[in-house]
């Protein structure tokens, strides 16, 4: 107690006793008493702190004062005498004297106010949601009360109730207006609307009562006020109500929106980035535009954050890596040969199974051995230790163990098979295998075929169940095949083998024939489809989904089982089949809904076609049995439903109905409207809450006042020991968390459309003004570092204050938290956990952009995201199927961390951080650290004998040896002696230059990329023209190239049959080193010299180097076709035309080079073609306006024919922006300017802008690449339309226009002689276009036409032709697409410039044509930086 008092006194105002003062008079004491009664705040504390004295003399009576001044004296900054209970200052004016505890209070943590504001927003959103739900329920009550007949006893009650409803505020809510207007819409549709009943229809009490539920027929359009048990999506009353005529088609708004994007280049670039992200899943379709827009607002479209995010989203579309199929570790060479033979046998069986009909496998014993079943163990009651031959096979005991795991964790998730029914089949199967093992069973050929076919189908079902059990066992016991001499490593090898077999089961000819459709085969395919959903195999889901739905409809599973089966069947068998049919149908329904969610397409099974009733739960079944026993004496007959599932399975089927209804509303025509989606979201919220309230008591979860669950409690339940066995209580808790996960998943899908349909937030005017003033004040001493700060509005109030946005963020955080709580076990969910975690993590990171860096909310989100990354990493180390690849995981980690960083972080720190991440993942994969800090230039090593290398100033290495950036030369040519040099080329950096020269010589001796004269010229010319280090404060580093372009898994490491892990790792190491060493040719290959036929692949020690572009090929490779794949001979004319170039080209390997080129041509062309298409999509601003979509998708392979110079000039002057239709023949290539015929991808000279632009324009597109198509009808078109200032948009965008309209893409710009000499940073507004940045780097010119001739491999005749055509091109402006590699130039005078004051130049560029030594190369031929679109801030 003493300690408590002392602590309390320490926190109270300190009392000072003053001696020698006069005694207090009587009236003063009375005043103090009255004052203390009026102000008792500190009276008690002061009494406890005061020291009483008994001195009788007045002079010795002490006066007590407080050491701290009162609040009024502190605010007025006057001296306080500290008298108690009222100081003199307060007593003089009659104010209450108060002393607060401000000096002793600790400061609130950072972000405390923000957390309070966020909580207020959450409470307001939840209050708004609950009020809307109450409105819906009260409205339903009122509508139901109108439909029933009223009696005389409750007329007065109903009258008062109606009167109260009229006066209630719920009549004014938008929800009720939406519900009640459906009746008006129905009357308008039927043409029965008139002025008399229009007013009453709007009233909730004047609306006509709806028909009873049993007599109600839904039309899907005007009866949304009913919460249907069967959601509707089409019209039943009037099939002609929906029109698809040209003037009424629902796609017209999307077409108009896309057309209006011609004047809104910012929207065009957003659409391009969205298309590059290839949105496929439903979540990505809805949130990608908002995510990329927010990143643009904070970081910019050309930032590392945007680049890595788009790369991450694109990598999600690749097929997830399969587990390695490895052989068991052996000690002797003899055993190694045996194991190699076993691997060959396994591969042969896989190929045979895929091509041979299942009915042709007549030998059941060999078939089971090929499935790794130890049939000898089936006949032994007590198993003996397995020998070497049976060591890799599954014994009967192990099979039973894995089946137990399946029924414990998977069976309730996918209620396809009943446990009791399966045991009957399994015991029968075991008996058959026992006879096979002892070879006592002999059957004739007539019955063997049918019997073994059924047993083989059951064996395949058993294989799928064992694979699911293996996944649980490996995750639970953390089994790794890399651990030496691990006795359980065989489970990992079996998992890889079963995964390979499971992918080809639907491809067997037996299942492709619809005449063999049966319940067992459909059960097998349904199990396989659920497995594909879990591992995220998109192509397999597409292949099986439609087939199982067609088979289910063929077997009439959607009808009532009692009506389909024959009445003459055996009653026992009839009940048995009814149960199987009912369970199988609803399992297919469940799979179809989640397949629709993953694929981003409408579901196939429509609710209005279904007659099959839901199965009953085991609890209801027990109650039903007890009721039958009670009524047995009365002989009461009641129709009983067959089909029993667990209570959890019934709840997830009911949830699938709700989720299917949500998906129907997303994909329904006309639903992507902000008002409609907000109102429909409340209807779905009501249905979801009803589902939650109807959960059984053991699965029920409570929602807190702010609309979420207690996440701390969920985290606390995750602290159990995973080594202990799961009892029934743990299983119930695990299933409860899964239901929680489904609940928040549905919540996010409800509110994602609401956020997606909101207009994209626009740039703030004051932000652009601040940026403009920043540029104008640069002459006062601003440095490059000052331009790195992006002063943008960090908040978007229109979205952040939205209740749907708040609910979405709550659901996202809750989803990630629940995933972490149950991720210790393998999650048997009908969705790919890895992809789902990445998508929701991006949503969480997007929400973190709104929080204060370092605040409590920001730190909570950061910890949540970092834990999610660690969870995926742990699963990747186990090499489980369906886990994101190392490349995707690396991009995910980098993207999240980049988004969590402040926008003003220096690029050196970002690159240092990214390099650490890159080396971290290399260590995890067993690879050496990435040598991304190599001193080699971007486009290859420089030869010490190069003439150009001796003439120009060498590049300089930065002070930090760990981060080398790619700097170009500081002057363009020798004639530009008066040009200003960069500060980095002064004499103080002489030592660094010497060090760089030595390193360059060493790299050249070590076997650089190129040593031939043509390669030298190409590198010197391209490096000189692509130099951007003197123009931008940021650089695109080798770290970015290595992280984005290098495939870390190595060549064919995931699908190889080689069992030696070391060989695979060595191949990965060699490939990675090769990629890092030859970064320039990873994606520059299509743009090299014409004679370089093996441009797509470099060979090191005769090993092919695997090259991965920034966006890999889509998983559906059959949709991505290249005409050049079947035409390897078309490169021969190119080699003949340039024999000298081919002779000097170092990339033509001797000996086997020709065969290697032909063998690898298809892959290389596809890789280059993919990159080319990517670059064109990203940098072409006319992709949705001036270019025909059909020609864009169906452009044929058209080779340009050689023609005379006159024809070539005509082709140049008449070149247009649009593609020519395929029927018009071959397009005239601008590559014919140089007088050479070039074919396919070789029809461009990289050193000629016209040729390169023609190459980018005339890419051969055969077939449709559906992955790059943007579905504008799903709400993307409303997002892409930037409505304000359409009339004020100027096509010749100036700085003032960009500041006013926030336009990011500039289609054209003036580049006359005076403006071309301006410093580039004036153009580089942080919100400027990628094209504008590309213009900056295209200012520099070539030295001589001879260099151009050497680099392109053309003779002097071609140069003269090029000069002549260049003059013609100057006089006649080309109407070609504006890309990074060719910029439009106008002839407007200097008076047209509105760019403000000129900035001090960092470098001068030789833009005067009179200073060109050759005089033949025009400014239109300048090459910009190929990677400038990826230039980070």
Curated annotation (Swiss-Prot):
PROSITE patterns: ZN2_CY6_FUNGAL_1 (PS00463), ZN2_CY6_FUNGAL_2 (PS50048). Residues 70-97 bind DNA. Residues 947-965, 994-1005 have a biased composition (Basic and acidic residues). Could be the target of the SNF1/CAT1 - SNF4/CAT3 kinase complex. GO terms for molecular function: DNA-binding transcription activator activity, RNA polymerase II-specific; DNA-binding transcription factor activity, RNA polymerase II-specific; RNA polymerase II cis-regulatory region sequence-specific DNA binding; sequence-specific DNA binding; zinc ion binding. The keyword Transcription regulation applies. It holds the Pfam family Zn_clus. GO terms for cellular component: cytoplasm; nucleus. Its main location: nucleus. Residues 20-38, 936-946, 1138-1162, 1221-1235, 1326-1348, 1363-1391, 1418-1433 have a biased composition (Polar residues). Keywords: Activator, Carbohydrate metabolism, DNA-binding, Metal-binding, Nucleus, Transcription, Transcription regulation, Zinc. InterPro entries: AtrR-like, Transcription_factor_dom_fun, Zn2-C6_fun-type_DNA-bd_sf, Zn2Cys6_DnaBD. GO terms for biological process: DNA-templated transcription; positive regulation of gluconeogenesis; positive regulation of glyoxylate cycle; positive regulation of transcription by RNA polymerase II. Residues 1349-1362 have a biased composition (Low complexity). Residues 20-40, 936-1024, 1137-1162, 1200-1236, 1324-1433 are annotated as: Disordered. It is found in: Nucleus. Activator of the gluconeogenic enzymes FBP1 and PCK1 genes. This is Regulatory protein CAT8.
